A protein has these predicted regions:
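Catalytic core of non-heme Fe(II) oxygenases with the double-stranded beta-helix
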Residues: 25, 51-125, 165-173
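A structural signal for short, well-ordered beta-strand segments
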Residues: 39-42, 71-73, 156-160
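Residues that flank catalytic or metal-binding motifs in active/ligand-binding sites
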Residues: 10, 38-39, 67, 81-83, ...
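Short acidic-glycine-tyrosine-enriched beta hairpin
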Residues: 122-135
Length: 174
Protein backbone atom coordinates (compact mmCIF):
# COMPACT_ATOMS: atom_id res chain seq x y z
CA UNK A 1 0.00 0.00 0.00
CA UNK A 2 1.62 3.23 -1.19
CA UNK A 3 -1.20 5.78 -1.00
CA UNK A 4 -4.60 6.26 0.63
CA UNK A 5 -6.84 8.82 -1.06
CA UNK A 6 -9.41 10.73 1.00
CA UNK A 7 -8.72 9.66 4.58
CA UNK A 8 -10.83 12.64 5.73
CA UNK A 9 -13.86 10.94 4.16
CA UNK A 10 -13.48 8.08 6.64
CA UNK A 11 -12.07 9.53 9.86
CA UNK A 12 -12.78 12.86 11.56
CA UNK A 13 -9.15 13.02 12.75
CA UNK A 14 -8.17 14.07 9.22
CA UNK A 15 -10.99 16.63 9.00
CA UNK A 16 -9.79 18.13 12.28
CA UNK A 17 -6.24 18.19 10.90
CA UNK A 18 -7.39 20.05 7.76
CA UNK A 19 -9.17 22.60 9.97
CA UNK A 20 -6.26 23.09 12.38
CA UNK A 21 -5.74 26.82 12.93
CA UNK A 22 -1.98 26.81 12.27
CA UNK A 23 -2.51 25.03 8.96
CA UNK A 24 -5.48 27.16 7.91
CA UNK A 25 -3.77 30.41 8.92
CA UNK A 26 -0.87 29.54 6.61
CA UNK A 27 -3.22 28.57 3.77
CA UNK A 28 -5.18 31.82 4.14
CA UNK A 29 -1.91 33.79 4.12
CA UNK A 30 -1.00 32.10 0.83
CA UNK A 31 -4.41 31.98 -0.90
CA UNK A 32 -6.67 34.51 0.76
CA UNK A 33 -9.66 33.91 3.03
CA UNK A 34 -11.98 32.11 0.60
CA UNK A 35 -10.62 28.56 0.60
CA UNK A 36 -12.07 25.08 0.82
CA UNK A 37 -10.73 21.58 1.30
CA UNK A 38 -10.29 19.71 -1.96
CA UNK A 39 -9.06 16.44 -0.47
CA UNK A 40 -6.21 14.67 1.22
CA UNK A 41 -3.86 11.75 0.75
CA UNK A 42 -1.62 9.63 2.94
CA UNK A 43 1.66 8.66 1.29
CA UNK A 44 3.69 5.71 2.52
CA UNK A 45 6.97 5.24 0.65
CA UNK A 46 8.30 1.86 1.82
CA UNK A 47 11.95 0.89 2.16
CA UNK A 48 13.17 0.43 -1.41
CA UNK A 49 10.22 2.46 -2.75
CA UNK A 50 10.74 3.97 -6.18
CA UNK A 51 10.89 7.59 -7.25
CA UNK A 52 7.92 9.61 -8.45
CA UNK A 53 8.98 11.57 -11.51
CA UNK A 54 8.42 15.26 -12.15
CA UNK A 55 4.76 16.25 -12.27
CA UNK A 56 2.30 18.94 -11.23
CA UNK A 57 -0.70 18.13 -9.03
CA UNK A 58 -3.34 20.26 -10.75
CA UNK A 59 -3.32 18.39 -14.09
CA UNK A 60 -4.11 15.20 -12.12
CA UNK A 61 -6.97 16.93 -10.32
CA UNK A 62 -9.72 18.22 -12.60
CA UNK A 63 -10.34 21.68 -11.12
CA UNK A 64 -10.74 25.11 -12.71
CA UNK A 65 -9.23 27.51 -12.06
CA UNK A 66 -6.07 25.63 -11.10
CA UNK A 67 -5.67 27.49 -7.81
CA UNK A 68 -4.59 24.86 -5.28
CA UNK A 69 -2.05 24.64 -2.48
CA UNK A 70 -0.94 21.45 -0.79
CA UNK A 71 0.18 21.32 2.83
CA UNK A 72 2.51 18.30 3.11
CA UNK A 73 3.08 17.21 6.73
CA UNK A 74 5.93 14.80 7.43
CA UNK A 75 4.90 11.89 9.65
CA UNK A 76 8.52 10.66 9.69
CA UNK A 77 11.77 12.55 9.24
CA UNK A 78 12.10 13.17 5.49
CA UNK A 79 15.59 13.08 4.02
CA UNK A 80 17.16 12.82 0.60
CA UNK A 81 17.98 9.20 1.46
CA UNK A 82 14.36 8.18 2.17
CA UNK A 83 12.73 9.95 -0.76
CA UNK A 84 12.15 13.62 0.02
CA UNK A 85 10.34 15.92 -2.37
CA UNK A 86 12.29 18.06 -4.83
CA UNK A 87 10.73 21.21 -6.26
CA UNK A 88 11.55 23.77 -8.92
CA UNK A 89 10.82 27.06 -7.10
CA UNK A 90 8.65 29.47 -9.08
CA UNK A 91 7.69 26.86 -11.70
CA UNK A 92 4.00 27.36 -10.84
CA UNK A 93 4.19 30.70 -12.67
CA UNK A 94 4.68 28.86 -15.98
CA UNK A 95 1.22 27.29 -15.74
CA UNK A 96 0.21 23.74 -16.58
CA UNK A 97 2.87 21.80 -18.49
CA UNK A 98 2.02 18.90 -20.78
CA UNK A 99 2.56 15.58 -18.98
CA UNK A 100 3.27 13.84 -22.26
CA UNK A 101 6.15 11.52 -21.50
CA UNK A 102 5.07 7.96 -20.56
CA UNK A 103 6.57 6.36 -17.47
CA UNK A 104 5.94 2.78 -16.36
CA UNK A 105 5.41 2.12 -12.66
CA UNK A 106 5.44 -1.66 -12.50
CA UNK A 107 2.45 -2.63 -14.64
CA UNK A 108 0.82 0.81 -14.35
CA UNK A 109 1.37 3.45 -17.00
CA UNK A 110 1.81 6.99 -15.70
CA UNK A 111 2.75 10.26 -17.36
CA UNK A 112 5.46 12.74 -16.45
CA UNK A 113 6.73 16.14 -17.48
CA UNK A 114 9.41 15.75 -20.17
CA UNK A 115 12.92 16.42 -18.83
CA UNK A 116 13.36 19.19 -21.42
CA UNK A 117 10.58 21.21 -19.72
CA UNK A 118 12.24 21.18 -16.26
CA UNK A 119 14.87 23.67 -15.06
CA UNK A 120 16.90 21.13 -13.07
CA UNK A 121 19.51 23.74 -12.09
CA UNK A 122 16.87 25.37 -9.88
CA UNK A 123 15.79 22.09 -8.21
CA UNK A 124 15.71 22.16 -4.40
CA UNK A 125 15.36 19.29 -1.92
CA UNK A 126 12.63 19.68 0.73
CA UNK A 127 13.79 17.87 3.86
CA UNK A 128 11.60 17.94 6.95
CA UNK A 129 11.62 16.72 10.53
CA UNK A 130 8.63 14.62 11.61
CA UNK A 131 5.79 17.08 12.21
CA UNK A 132 7.26 19.65 9.83
CA UNK A 133 5.20 21.02 6.96
CA UNK A 134 5.91 22.29 3.47
CA UNK A 135 3.52 24.10 1.13
CA UNK A 136 3.48 24.02 -2.65
CA UNK A 137 1.19 25.33 -5.37
CA UNK A 138 -0.65 22.73 -7.44
CA UNK A 139 1.30 23.84 -10.52
CA UNK A 140 4.73 23.60 -8.88
CA UNK A 141 6.89 21.06 -10.69
CA UNK A 142 7.99 18.48 -8.15
CA UNK A 143 9.13 14.89 -7.72
CA UNK A 144 10.23 12.56 -4.95
CA UNK A 145 13.32 10.41 -4.85
CA UNK A 146 13.58 6.69 -4.15
CA UNK A 147 13.67 5.43 -0.56
CA UNK A 148 17.16 3.98 -0.11
CA UNK A 149 16.69 3.29 3.62
CA UNK A 150 15.19 0.50 5.71
CA UNK A 151 12.47 2.83 7.08
CA UNK A 152 9.15 4.09 5.72
CA UNK A 153 8.80 7.72 4.60
CA UNK A 154 5.21 8.76 5.39
CA UNK A 155 3.41 12.03 4.85
CA UNK A 156 -0.05 13.55 4.85
CA UNK A 157 -0.91 15.84 1.93
CA UNK A 158 -3.91 18.12 2.45
CA UNK A 159 -5.08 19.94 -0.68
CA UNK A 160 -6.88 23.29 -0.47
CA UNK A 161 -8.37 25.24 -3.36
CA UNK A 162 -9.95 28.65 -3.72
CA UNK A 163 -13.68 28.83 -3.08
CA UNK A 164 -14.22 29.76 -6.74
CA UNK A 165 -12.44 26.62 -8.00
CA UNK A 166 -14.77 23.87 -9.20
CA UNK A 167 -14.42 20.16 -9.86
CA UNK A 168 -14.64 19.68 -13.65
CA UNK A 169 -14.09 15.93 -13.93
CA UNK A 170 -16.64 13.16 -13.99
CA UNK A 171 -18.20 11.66 -10.85
CA UNK A 172 -16.06 8.52 -11.06
CA UNK A 173 -12.79 10.45 -11.31
CA UNK A 174 -12.82 12.29 -8.01
Amino acid sequence: LRKINGPSLHDSFFVDHARHSRLLDSIVDLMGPDVKLFGDQLFMKPPGGIEKTYHQDCPYFSIEPMAMITAWVALDDVTEENGCMYVVPGSHKIGAVDHSEPWMVGQRRDMKIPDSAIDLQRERAITLRAGGCSFHHGLTQHRSGPNRTDRFRRGLATHYMTARSQWTGGPDEQ
